[in-house]
């Protein structure tokens, strides 16, 4: 039992570290793009809302 527990702990640790390091290594560019997209969307949303209000009024 203790050996199995050790193996499970090692697997869990590697999984956690893998999931933490993988996005930073592979998707650093993709991550930046998505955050940029989010900020631009947030920046443009007030203008879109005001346009909608103008169209309604």
Curated annotation (Swiss-Prot):
User: Per UniProt, what does mutating residue 41 to A do?
Assistant: Retains 10% of wild-type activity
Describe what happens upon changing residue 33 to A. Small decrease in activity
**What UniProt keywords are attached to this protein's entry?**
Competence, Cytoplasm, Secreted, Sporulation
Domain of life of the native organism: Bacteria
GO BP annotation list: establishment of competence for transformation; sporulation resulting in formation of a cellular spore
The impact of changing residue 40 to A is: Retains less than 10% of wild-type activity
> Where in or outside the cell is it found?
Secreted; Cytoplasm
Description of the deletion phenotype = Decreases expression from the aprE promoter.
Induction line: Part of the rapH-phrH operon, which is transcribed from the SigA-driven rapH promoter. phrH is also transcribed from a putative SigA-driven promoter embedded within the rapH gene sequence.
Q: Any chance you could tell me the propeptide residue ranges?
A: 1-34, 41-57
From what organism does this protein derive?
Bacillus subtilis (strain 168)
Q: Enumerate the residue ranges of region (Disordered).
A: 26-57
The molecule here is called Phosphatase RapH inhibitor
Q: Which family does it belong to?
A: Belongs to the Phr family.
């Amino acid at each position: 039992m203790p050996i199995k527990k050790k193996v499970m702990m090692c697997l869990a640790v590697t999984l956690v570290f893998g999931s933490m390091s993988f996005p930073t290594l592979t998707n650093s560019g993709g991550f930046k793009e998505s955050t940029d997209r989010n900020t631009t969307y947030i920046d443009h949303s007030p203008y879109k809302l005001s346009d909608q209000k103008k169209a309604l009024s």
